[in-house]
């Protein structure tokens, strides 16, 4: 078996169709690349709401309603959070709730709908939620220039969460908001980054037809000093360090998790199925994103390293289009090119590039957050369940997950996370097979089981999310079954509910949500009496009625 040398190299390569696959045996890709850890910088005064960091330097409310107040005061002692940071052991699964995408204003200087946020946090606390998840947008917090950080609006939110006894999962969102499922607002990358992408369009992921994607910087340029003297990975590391220093007083007590964005929608994947401008529609197979000159240069070097230079000119020329199905494409059909020596070579390279990207950013994150007690690092992996029942798993392959009938694509990811002690956050936990279009061979349940097994075998904590907004008991039942109704060692370490908004605070939805949270977090989940849970949830809904109504109205405006 020949090994691939996947070292990054610069230089352009012609984007022409590759030669027909040859009969040769190709090995799995070479080992991962680790970025060196960097010594942390001293924390600045928390009184300063806006930070300016030299990029050239070394990388380093209103009172509660009486009924709600009585409800909180009546809770047993052990149910109150320890804001000081000492978490008590819980048997169930803690539930977090995603904040609206536009929680912080685009200028970064405050919160949108502040009164709604305040009422919402109090309501979530009353329902037993552990905390919230919020996107810390690169395009907001470092918008004005390299090293000029503005966390003012996020500081306001952290203080509000702490006051209400809620924990925070902070997402380092290095991607654009807009263009993916559920994106209701648009928050582009920092304007100084977009200026560099305009000068060098190969910094954007590119498909076979030359279409550029500006959601996230191409991983092919990870190690290139293309952002005013810094590499993208250095920019990500500097941003995370600035966040850590600015929120030092909240780390480990209020901020308990840093989810590190690694691609579109914050997920470790390629932007193979962009919804913007109708490019992709479910359940299309998507397209490979390897046609910027940095990616093509790496592909060329990898092909030469295995003695097959003709394989290094471009990706598969017969892999179809965004909205095709596997059988439409010679590459993805039952015995197609994916299952040939050429296909194995290409998929090994393509998926290994994604793994190395994750390794580099995780190394940077570990260098920043290692030694910060009480703070976990997590990485989000996409739940691409359509065409999972086919042999080629085409939609997973174009996204960078080399998962087929013959090859496990999630074990390598889990092992990478294990090296850094990171949590694997996975989506589509709420889905059942029979709810999906059967002709697309969707298998969300089997996919979740496969990822859970990979996490378990690698010793990695598994956390979950619902991929789409769901407020019905059927979805809640599926989440409870998948995440909580298991032996303790197989339970998810956390679940994040998508998403806070006016629909969540509709009376029936809110009552069902309160019952769901109780089922997830109660000790001995399988022994919980459903009728008792419903009664208690009704009590929460009644006690928080005015608060929830206020939140629903404010969030609708």
From Swiss-Prot:
The EC number(s) given in the record are 3.2.1.2
Q: Give the UniProt keywords, A-Z.
A: Carbohydrate metabolism, Chloroplast, Glycosidase, Hydrolase, Plastid, Polysaccharide degradation, Transit peptide
User: Which sites bind substrate?
Assistant: 135, 175, 183, 380, 385, 427, 466-467, 499
Active-site residues (renumbered): 267 (proton donor), 465 (proton acceptor)
Q: Where is the transit peptide?
A: 1-38
Q: Would I find Plastid among this entry's keywords?
A: yes
- How would you summarize the temperature dependence of activity? Optimum temperature is 35 degrees Celsius.
Top-level class of the enzyme under EC nomenclature? hydrolase
Q: Where is the signal peptide?
A: none
User: So what does this thing catalyse?
Assistant: Hydrolysis of (1->4)-alpha-D-glucosidic linkages in polysaccharides so as to remove successive maltose units from the non-reducing ends of the chains
InterPro entries per the record?
Glyco_hydro_14 (IPR001554), Glyco_hydro_14_CS (IPR018238), Glyco_hydro_14B_pln (IPR001371), Glycoside_hydrolase_SF (IPR017853)
Q: What Pfam families does its record include? A: Glyco_hydro_14 (PF01373)
Q: Which GO terms describe its cellular component?
A: chloroplast
Compartments, record wording: Plastid, Chloroplast
Q: Does the keyword Plastid apply?
A: yes
Q: Which GO terms describe its molecular function?
A: beta-amylase activity
Q: What does this chain do?
A: Possesses beta-amylase activity in vitro. May be involved in cold resistance by mediating the accumulation of maltose upon freezing stress, thus contributing to the protection of membranes.
Q: Which family does it belong to?
A: Belongs to the glycosyl hydrolase 14 family.
This protein is called: Beta-amylase 2, chloroplastic
